[in-house]
């Protein structure tokens, strides 16, 4: 059974329950405001946040937190459910086109919602170009592989170019100014700021208008802020929390999360992470486990680029060729 774009939108909106609903279960308005100040805007987020973390929010005692948790549990069932219900939830998943039909094909339709997709590769492979292309294709109608929605873009390296968005939008015959207006942009100054920006996303996403979160690139700030083996453990703990939050946002708001990542040379790298030439994505096991889909990008012949699907819960390993043009990521003319 196919699910239409309208049905997906209505289902997503129906499942986004504001914390204001808790007022009907005895939680006063001042405590709800405290939740919002702590970056918690929906009932689902209340349920997925630990009591220990909720108690860290200024003004919330253990007694209040327990009462809030109890009220949230009355609104949304969090125990065992029939697998048929989970099937209904999975049917709300849809894909966003990358701009390349060949790449969309090996991905099973495109970048999937409710999960994290990571692309990694050396410089000039098209990671940022793919991010820019997705900013436009996400706004296309459903029948054209879009999501008819907005994009939240976190830029960690200062490589976001609004003029490039306008150029790609013109290639798709969309209004350039409207496309730019539908992209919420933030420059992450360091890893701490990057994590804060993701915490703040709950308020934006609770509108139900967003379809995609882009982080370009996920590890740049963490590499700078945590240097050497002595800080590696702390870095991975922070990264794990960051990725956990992104995954929660993807599931709760039915959005796609698209991460770009850098690579490092490691001649002795294990086959689990490394490509044939020994390059491997940074972030280790933490990032590998968080990303549902991992795609290696590399340079091909001439202007061609090669995308290899390395890990996916839905599709087998496969690769395809794409090029970077005025419309962003497109198919090779060959």
UniProtKB/Swiss-Prot annotation:
Pfam families: HHH_5, Rad51. SsDNA binds at residues 223, 226, 229, 235, 305. PROSITE patterns: RECA_2, RECA_3. It is found in: Nucleus. One of its GO terms (cellular component) is condensed nuclear chromosome. ATP binds at residues 121-128. Its main location: nucleus. Keywords: ATP-binding, Cell cycle, DNA-binding, Meiosis, Nucleotide-binding, Nucleus, Sporulation. It comes from the Eukaryota. The keyword DNA-binding applies. Gene3D superfamilies: 5' to 3' exonuclease, C-terminal subdomain, P-loop containing nucleotide triphosphate hydrolases. GO terms for molecular function: ATP binding; ATP hydrolysis activity; ATP-dependent activity, acting on DNA; ATP-dependent DNA damage sensor activity; ATPase inhibitor activity; DNA strand exchange activity; double-stranded DNA binding; single-stranded DNA binding. PANTHER family: MEIOTIC RECOMBINATION PROTEIN DMC1_LIM15 HOMOLOG, RECA/RAD51/RADA DNA STRAND-PAIRING FAMILY MEMBER. Double stacked ring-shaped homooctamer. Forms a ternary complex with MEI5 and SAE3. Interacts with RDH54. Required for meiotic recombination, synaptonemal complex formation and cell cycle progression. Recruited to meiosis recombination hotspots by MEI5 and SAE3. This is Meiotic recombination protein DMC1. The gene is DMC1.
């Amino acid at each position: 059974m196919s699910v239409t774009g309208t049905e997906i939108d209505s289902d997503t909106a129906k499942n986004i329950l504001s914390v204001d609903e808790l007022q009907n279960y005895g939680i006063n308005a001042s405590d709800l405001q405290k939740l919002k100040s702590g970056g918690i805007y929906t009932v689902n987020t209340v349920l997925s946040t630990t009591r220990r973390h909720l108690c860290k929010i200024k003004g919330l005692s253990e007694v209040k937190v327990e009462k809030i948790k109890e009220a949230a549990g009355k609104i949304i069932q969090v125990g065992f459910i029939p697998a048929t219900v989970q099937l209904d939830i999975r049917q709300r998943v849809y894909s966003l086109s990358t701009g390349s039909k060949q790449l969309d094909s090996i991905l099973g339709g495109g970048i999937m919602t409710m999960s994290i997709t990571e692309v990694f590769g050396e410089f000039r492979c098209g990671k940022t170009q793919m991010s820019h292309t997705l900013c436009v294709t996400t706004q296309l109608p459903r029948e054209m592989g879009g999501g008819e929605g907005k994009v939240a873009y976190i830029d960690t390296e200062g490589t976001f170019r609004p003029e490039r968005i306008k150029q790609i939008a013109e290639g798709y015959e969309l209004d350039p100014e409207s496309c730019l207006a539908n992209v919420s942009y933030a420059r992450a100054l360091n890893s701490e700021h990057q994590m804060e920006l993701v915490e703040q996303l709950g308020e934006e996403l609770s509108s139900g208008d967003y379809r995609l979160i882009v982080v370009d690139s996920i590890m740049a700030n963490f590499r700078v802020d945590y240097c050497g083996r002595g800080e590696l453990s702390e870095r991975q703990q922070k990264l794990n929390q960051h990725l956990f939050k992104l995954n929660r946002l993807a599931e709760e708001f039915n959005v796609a999360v698209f991460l770009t990542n850098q690579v490092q040379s490691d001649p002795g790298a294990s086959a689990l992470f490394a490509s044939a030439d020994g390059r491997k994505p940074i972030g280790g096991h933490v990032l590998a486990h968080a990303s549902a889909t991992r795609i290696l990008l590399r340079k091909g012949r001439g202007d061609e680029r090669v995308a290899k699907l390395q890990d996916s819960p839905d599709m087998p390993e496969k690769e395809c060729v794409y090029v970077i043009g005025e419309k962003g990521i497109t198919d090779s003319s060959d």
